[in-house]
């Protein structure tokens, strides 16, 4: 399609899924410049924008980079709203017409020449571009193998101009500032490409032994030898700048080494293409320890056969994370997300744990809650692994260590008090999906040698939550709860969390129910009574007349209340008060109205409002974040997902649909352009502060690391379609929005397949469920047989 600006009202001229839903295309590099896609494998991940910028990291075992900024970078985690600039790491291909001197670049950066046609295509298995300049079509494809940290690039140049063309092609992969200790770059004929070498900086002797096996080389290998090369960034760029490098303007690259200069990887190929002729080039780009590893990677991958074998293996790897539901509804965008992209994102989180060695405990448990629907055995193992690090007090650590030698880093060095809450939440979902009640009796041994059953460890965790309360019965917050940067409410040891108080009630409620269903009546009674006590404390101390306060500071100041000019109302306490049964009918009506009036935006409900505009030092650093960004009043999709789940739990189907649909770009062009997000993932937030900063409200963070996805997948399965495990049965209690006349679902559940047709019938007053033509009086499917297919007809009131 033309790369010109899209038509104002036809979203399909800007972006659209392929017919089979396996890919999503964007037809402009300028309308949504930060939109893109991501790939990962067991060792690495790479996020690519439609314009060619890239952010990549691999594990050794901690995250590391092989393409760097051109200046000294601080080590950090994946960032929301990653800023891009001319010298940002990327993967670029310059194309020069040798007869006219015209210069282009693909995908779009750095030359930024307008293309005749442009298509960026995010796929499940690879990322592609198809760009046409002056009759020359350049097709790029990047993919990953399953187990090695290497990018596999294919570039096809096709002459569609109708005349013979003389061209030069220049793959240019900047390497950046690798190290202040040692960095270099040069061409290796023996290895077949450019190899850049460095030493990760260190000063302590112990670090030498820890780092000596690091992959400190970065390579760009070619299948076909080039006519020339450059390995020095400044020599390549020269006086022309990246948009017109001096080396590219010359007849031939200068074969420059980099000797303690910023290295780069640039190759030159000369092409003479007859009309309709095409040439294909393949490259491998990534990190390595030494020449032997580089040579092995070249032998393994750098051929047509190697690329094909890697693609086949990677497709099988992703197949292991296929979803358990396929849907057909009146909303095609929802269908595409749920059928293709949402389970992929859930799998990414649970399979590689966000590519970290110490995931936050809450993230680890929620990510693996999602895996309960894709790979239940993996989810089970994650629960047992997490509990193996439980403290003798019953508390859970701030992070879960995944490999030997891993340490708690960054936010995991800050004490938070919510981690025990997520254990029964995980179990509630896991048991409903699998029926694996035997896990409750599984024995888990901790580092101190103590061996206890899962059930006993949950008892201890729930008791820890009850003990970690003040005299009023409210939960201490320390330096944060789910909201990490709420770090100054209770740093002196007195402040309490309103959210954690009702979340504790919800956790106790779930665990009491699990105990009751599994013959643990004494514990069910004990924790059931505790639910009533915690809820009573929340209503006595936190109810502000129309909604629940967010907390009470060390100095006894309630916040998140009507008297506050900023941060007047927070979403999370309201959502979890619904889940915990804290709010009675009158309170429920009041808080739902308050959320709609004060938190709703066209892009979903914000996390708090109004956003803070200055530091409030009895709340914490979240108030220093930009208004509407992240925890300071963004449409923070993880919190939105909690609210969505709570709405389904109280049976508010239409309000829930409104919230669910707002997570997706569109359906109109203006909404999609404002968000700038390609719907191949759910981002961790869209900008908030809609009333304060409307120009940027709705803008996507583009960050695909988010606890949102497991909850949204659960909401679709168990809320929207109501297909949820209940003991040994599958319950059917759908909550379709009232304007949907019908929907179809194919659900995999406990080894059986359920083909469900849902129809809304005018005049009907009661839900009816037929299983293979026979009415089910309790709207459940009993006696499920693995391997069997069940036909369900579900008739909903009109």
Swiss-Prot record:
Its EC number is 2.4.1.321. The active site is at 484 (proton donor). GO terms for biological process: cellulose catabolic process. It catalyses: 4-O-beta-D-glucopyranosyl-D-gluconate + phosphate = D-gluconate + alpha-D-glucose 1-phosphate. Keywords: Carbohydrate metabolism, Cellulose degradation, Glycosyltransferase, Polysaccharide degradation, Transferase. InterPro entries: 6-hairpin_glycosidase_sf, 6hp_glycosidase-like_sf, Gal_mutarotase_sf_dom, GH36_catalytic, GH94_Enzymes, GH94N_CBAP, Glyco_hydro_65_N_sf, Glyco_hydrolase_94. GO terms for molecular function: carbohydrate binding; hexosyltransferase activity. SUPFAM superfamilies: Galactose mutarotase-like, Six-hairpin glycosidases. It comes from the Bacteria. It is an enzyme of class 2 (transferase). Catalyzes the reversible phosphorolysis of cellobionic acid (4-O-beta-D-glucopyranosyl-D-gluconate), a probable step in cellulose degradation. May be part of a metabolic pathway where cellobionic acid is converted into alpha-D-glucose 1-phosphate and D-gluconic acid to enter glycolysis and the pentose phosphate pathway, respectively. Produces 4-O-beta-D-glucopyranosyl-D-glucuronate from alpha-D-glucose 1-phosphate and D-glucuronate with low activity in the synthetic direction. Homodimer. This is Cellobionic acid phosphorylase. It comes from Xanthomonas campestris pv. campestris (strain ATCC 33913 / DSM 3586 / NCPPB 528 / LMG 568 / P 25).
